[in-house]
């Protein structure tokens, strides 16, 4: 038994067209279209076929999902570079994970959300907000090793999401679940230096924009503010200015290792702080490109893995003694995708 809205949600989360799904389950596209628009009860054998085709347990189709449009930090500049179908896949997957998170949190407590909402104004710039937020959260001005842990301590759930081919242009986004829990989703296929930057970029949106009542500010302005916020958060002016002053090309690898940001971002920040001039920054960027480092830089940057989702799932499997089958039924997600959210760093003891 099920409702059509969930069939559409499941189908779009897999990037499958009506025609493709209809062929997989042996019905006409017209019949499937009617099913997706219907509130009528659907026969169990057909739902089982659809579940197999879309890789969802039967319980998924009985869940009640919030059908309102997701309020996220995915602003126009990012949307403009992505195909509509790819965006739909990401949004639907996030909608499904958000529901699972809310369900898990019925039995688990996480740190209280403690990041304040701060309005960015002409008098109160994004870099000043980043500086004050770090002081408020007692995050040191030195390079931040366990940066994900520092954000999760503030009650923000971080999720490294495996996107695949549909999300090569997707960096990350911030959203709230139906019950009001903030989640930052990041593309797990990105290099770690980009993950670190995009994490703090999203914290900037969460601080300055996601709860703002200012409807006049353009999305381009918001992106610029989030970039400036991330720059000050990751490379604080007062601390990094000595390292970036008269920065030479040969310094980039060492500074990347120290500050755990990309070489391109170091060049950008050095120019932003007037530590190097326009011509020097252009020369550095060109040299990176010639060395094949425009898309994939040399030099390893570490990043810690998110732990809140891992612990939430682990508590259900271990402390609350759910079997994987029971958890899959409760969340409406297949076991392999639960394990993906659980993370591969820890062994599953069930």
Feature locations, PLM:
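Active-site hotspot residues in diverse enzymes, especially metal/ion-binding acidic/histidine motifs
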Residues: 1-350
């Amino acid at each position: 038994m099920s409702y059509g809205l969930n069939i559409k949600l499941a189908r779009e989360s897999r990037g499958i067209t009506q025609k493709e799904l209809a062929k997989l389950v042996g019905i006409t596209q017209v019949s499937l279209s009617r099913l997706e628009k219907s509130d009528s009860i659907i026969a169990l054998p057909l739902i089982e076929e659809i579940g197999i085709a879309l890789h969802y347990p039967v319980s998924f189709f009985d869940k009640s999902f919030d059908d309102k449009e997701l309020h996220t930090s995915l602003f126009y500049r990012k949307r403009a570079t992505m195909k509509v179908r790819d965006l739909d896949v990401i949004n639907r997957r996030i909608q499904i994970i958000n529901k699972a998170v809310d369900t898990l949190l019925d039995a688990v407590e996480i740190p209280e959300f403690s990041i304040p909402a701060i309005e960015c104004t002409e008098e109160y710039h994004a870099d000043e907000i980043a500086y004050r937020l770090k002081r408020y959260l007692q995050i040191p001005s030195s390079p931040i090793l366990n940066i994900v842990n520092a954000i999760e301590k503030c009650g923000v759930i971080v999720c490294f999401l495996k996107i695949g081919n549909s999300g090569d242009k997707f960096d990350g986004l911030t959203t709230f679940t139906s019950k009001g829990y903030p989640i930052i989703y990041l593309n797990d296929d990105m290099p770690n230096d980009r993950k670190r930057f995009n994490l703090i970029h999203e914290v900037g949106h969460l601080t300055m924009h996601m709860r703002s009542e200012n409807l006049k500010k353009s999305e381009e302005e918001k992106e610029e503010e989030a970039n400036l916020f991330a720059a000050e958060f990751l490379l604080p002016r007062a601390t990094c200015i000595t390292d970036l002053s008269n920065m030479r090309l040969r310094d980039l690898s060492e500074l990347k290792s120290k500050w755990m940001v990309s070489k391109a971002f170091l060049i950008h920040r050095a120019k932003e702080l007037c530590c190097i001039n326009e011509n020097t920054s252009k020369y550095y960027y060109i040299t990176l490109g010639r060395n094949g480092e425009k898309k994939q830089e040399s030099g390893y940057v570490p990043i810690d893995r998110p732990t809140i989702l891992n612990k939430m799932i682990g508590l259900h499997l271990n402390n609350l003694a759910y079997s994987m089958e029971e958890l899959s039924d409760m969340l409406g997600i297949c076991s392999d995708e639960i394990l993906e959210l659980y993370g591969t760093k820890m062994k599953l003891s069930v």
